[in-house]
């Protein structure tokens, strides 16, 4: 047995894929990239079962099975086959061998990242590595395997019957974001939009114009916004969010220049006021750095996971070789046939005689992870993130590709559903069905991760296929207008 998707480049792959796709009779009326899907999944039975369920184990099983059912036939077959082709497999696994120094900042700290949220530099380094992998391997062969650079969508159209649900999900995303940035106290959720004028002030400061601190557009340099956070700090955070975290270092340098100017021009300032201003701005910058770390933690959520890159990193770390890749593909394909909870997943991985089974278990995040799991580093594996691997390697069992006709459900592939209202936005419609099931069985406010909101957020970001990278998408997806 071996990988049957034999292709070293796009030309060879297209030659392999043409007869394969004809045999599978792929369709694209409901999905962005051609799939096996011929109808929008009907999950009404799962919703009824959830309403009658009495214990968490049963509820988990119902929801997990609904996820598999919802995504069983919607995967982008072309992109999944390309991701698993012999050339991409060989190049990707050898890429990590050759680029150990390039991934060192987070790979060498993997044990720490299994326990807590990452530093901003570790997130940036991950994305730089993902971009390098994509370029070196020649991964991006069409619009559904590329890195996105567009602004987030301003409007998101949904059918009237699900509009209330989508708006409810969006409101909860905003609430969770504000709790993360502002804490869980009485000011949580009060964070308002940051004005363009304030952002311009922050950009000028980052550009070296320290004189702007003498007369900020909001008046008193210590003035706070609704959240209780100084406006100077929130302006700095926004600049870092829009233009990159290096801007905070630029602001630090501007404040050092300010300090020197104050020392050299004491006669031009009221007694003690110059040093007081420097100290105040230094405090505001320190607060901005901490807020930026939290904001970066938010940006680390799954919308920023480069799914194929992480999948190959986990495979490489677990000891998968090109010769054994087909066994991992088969395991993940079977995983998408019927839902498995975390315990069953670990049992199955423990039971396999293949070394990569134990290797994957050793990569799993700690049970006592410090912080919200939604914000863990995108290179850290969890039982839930096994579905990320499945979305890439488990749709087509590479040793017997024709078996793909049986379908294999992995949640991230829901993004391949179209968002066109001409076909009733099957992406949002399917996510809402899952949300209703989840809402019926669980107290969503108490959950660290609401997986359905997470999927909808990625649709807002503009991901139309799990094989795309969305890190460079500009703007805040939660500012979208639902119509």
From Swiss-Prot:
Cofactor: how bound = Stimulated by divalent cations such as Mn2+, Co2+, and Mg2+.
Q: Where in the cell is it found?
A: Virion
Q: List the disulfide bonds.
A: none
- How does it get modified post-translation? Cleaved at the DEVD motif by host CASP3/caspase 3 in mammalian cells giving rise to cleavage products that remain associated. Only the monomeric form is cleaved. Little or no cleavage in tick cells. Caspase cleavage reduces the viral polymerase activity. Caspase cleavage is not required for productive infection in mammalian or tick host cells.
Q: Which UniProt keywords apply?
A: Capsid protein, Helical capsid protein, Ribonucleoprotein, RNA-binding, Viral nucleoprotein, Virion
Task: Check the record and name the Gene3D superfamilies matching this protein.
Answer: 1.20.58.1110
Site positions (Homooligomerization) = 214, 277, 353
Q: Which Pfam families match?
A: Nairo_nucleo (PF02477)
A GO molecular-function descriptor: RNA binding
Q: Which InterPro entries match?
A: Nairo_nucleocap (IPR003486)
Q: Which cofactor does it need?
A: Mn(2+)
**GO CC terms of this entry:** helical viral capsid; ribonucleoprotein complex; viral nucleocapsid
Task: Give site residues, Cleavage by host CASP3/caspase 3.
Answer: 270-271
Motif stretch (DEVD):
267-270
Domain comment, as recorded: The DEVD motif is a CASP3/caspase 3 cleavage site essential for viral replication in host cell. However, the importance for viral replication is apprently not linked to caspase cleavage. This motif is involved in homooligomerization.
Q: Which family does it belong to?
A: Belongs to the nairovirus nucleocapsid protein family.
Record's function text: Binds dsRNA and ssRNA and probably participates in the packaging of viral genome. In the dsRNA binding mode, the nucleocapsid protein specifically binds to the vRNA panhandle secondary structure formed at the termini of viral genome. Does not discriminate between viral and nonviral RNAs through ssRNA binding mode. Displays dsDNA endonuclease activity that is sequence non-specific.
How this chain assembles, per its entry, is: Probable homooligomer; forms a double superhelical polymer. Monomer.
Q: Please report the name of this protein according to its UniProt entry.
A: Nucleoprotein
Q: Which organism is it from?
A: Dugbe virus (isolate ArD44313) (DUGV)
């Amino acid at each position: 047995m071996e990988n049957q998707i034999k292709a070293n480049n796009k030309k060879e792959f297209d030659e392999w894929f043409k007869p394969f796709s004809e045999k599978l009779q792929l369709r694209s009326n409901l999905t962005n990239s051609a799939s096996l899907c011929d109808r929008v999944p009907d999950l009404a039975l799962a919703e009824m079962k959830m309403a009658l369920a009495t214990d968490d184990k049963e509820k988990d099983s119902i929801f997990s099975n609904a996820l598999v059912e919802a995504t069983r036939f919607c995967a982008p077959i072309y992109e999944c086959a390309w991701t698993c082709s012999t050339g991409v497999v060989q190049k990707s696994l050898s890429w990590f061998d050759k680029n150990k120094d390039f991934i060192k900042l987070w790979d060498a700290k993997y044990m720490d990242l299994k326990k807590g949220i990452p530093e901003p530099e570790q997130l940036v380094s991950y994305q730089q590595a993902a971009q390098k992998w994509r370029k070196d391997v020649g991964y991006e062969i069409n619009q559904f395997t590329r890195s996105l650079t567009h602004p987030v969508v301003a409007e998101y159209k949904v059918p009237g019957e699900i509009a209330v649900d989508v708006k409810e999900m969006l409101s909860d995303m905003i609430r969770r974001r504000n709790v993360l940035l502002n804490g869980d106290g009485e000011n949580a959720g009060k964070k308002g939009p940051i004005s363009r004028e304030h952002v311009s002030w922050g950009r000028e400061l980052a550009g070296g114009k320290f004189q702007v601190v003498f007369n900020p557009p909001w008046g008193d340099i210590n003035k706070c916004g609704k959240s209780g956070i100084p406006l100077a700090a929130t302006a700095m955070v926004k600049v870092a969010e829009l233009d990159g975290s290096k801007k905070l270092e630029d602001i630090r340098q501007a404040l050092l220049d300010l300090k020197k100017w104050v020392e050299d021009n004491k006669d031009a300032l009221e007694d003690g006021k110059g040093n007081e201003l420097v100290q105040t701005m230094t405090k505001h910058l320190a607060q901005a750095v901490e807020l930026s770390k939290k904001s970066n933690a938010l940006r680390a959520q799954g919308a920023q996971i480069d799914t194929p890159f992480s999948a190959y990193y986990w495979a490489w770390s677990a000891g998968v070789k090109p010769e054994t890749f087909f066994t991992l593909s088969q395991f993940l394909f079977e995983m998408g046939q019927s839902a498995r909870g975390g315990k069953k997943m670990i049992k199955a991985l423990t039971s396999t005689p293949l070394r990569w089974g134990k290797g994957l278990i050793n990569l799993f995040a700690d049970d006592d992870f410090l912080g919200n799991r939604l914000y863990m580093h995108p290179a850290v594996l969890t039982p839930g993130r096994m579905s990320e691997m499945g979305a890439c390697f488990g749709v087509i069992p590479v040793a017997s590709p024709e078996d793909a006709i049986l379908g294999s459900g992995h949640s991230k592939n829901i993004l391949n559903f179209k968002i066109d209202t001409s076909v009733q936005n099957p992406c949002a419609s399917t996510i809402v069905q899952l949300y209703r099931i989840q809402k019926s069985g669980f107290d969503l406010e108490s959950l660290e991760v609401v997986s359905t909101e997470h999927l909808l957020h990625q649709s807002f970001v503009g991901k139309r296929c799990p094989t795309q990278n969305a890190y460079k998408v500009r703007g805040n997806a939660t500012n979208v207008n639902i119509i």
